Amino acid sequence: MKRIVLGIMLCLSLSVIAVYAQEKTETKPAPPVTNAEAAPKAGQVAPEFTLANDEGKQVSLKQFRGKWVVLYFYPKDFTSGCTLEARNFKRDSAHYEKANAVILGVSTDSVDSHKSFCEKEGLNFKLLADTDKKVSEMYGSKMEYNGNIYSARNTFLIGPDGKIAKVFMQVKPMTHSEEVLAAIAELSKK
């Protein structure tokens, strides 16, 4: 009888160990894959593009020559990090205006999604719909995650001359707006 009880206990112990080991080795989603190596560098002329904004109107980068352009790419409307980043740009918008800067947000979301996001958050700058993902790719901000394509969280500060003045890769939404404002202030001194 003791042997049977010991045998059962051994089997149960091995089963628990096997389940625990399986949980430990389950695969986690792969990290996002980006084409960041293709991103234009500081000093280069910013690649030109035209995209529809949150109102469905066509917006071209060249429209903003003579101004600083904060071209920020972000993954998805209505997500926590993207909402925080947009709110901080909105909060600081008077400082950007004073610095002769415009803010343009770009993601792979649709015009309708951008419109809803702008309305819900009361955004006072334009969001551009890169639905074919070509601009994200051109700026090294195309990201694949779990089989979907998004824009990676990168920002290109474009000078009034149309050249990229500074590149911010994989930014932190909480402090990014202040970081960009500081860069504009520093670069404006030169």
Regions found by a protein language model. Name each.
Residues 123-125, 142-145, 149-156:
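Structural micro-motif
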Residues 55-56, 132, 161:
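Residue-level recognition of short loop/turn positions
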Residues 151-190:
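Thiol-/selenol-based redox modules, centered on thioredoxin-like
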Residues 61-83:
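Short active-site neighborhood of thiol/selenol oxidoreductases, capturing the structured segment around
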Residues 1-48, 190:
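N-terminal targeting signals for export/organelle localization
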Residues 83-123, 133-138:
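Structural microenvironment flanking redox-active thiols in thiol-disulfide oxidoreductases
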Residues 40-43, 49-68:
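A short beta-strand-turn-helix
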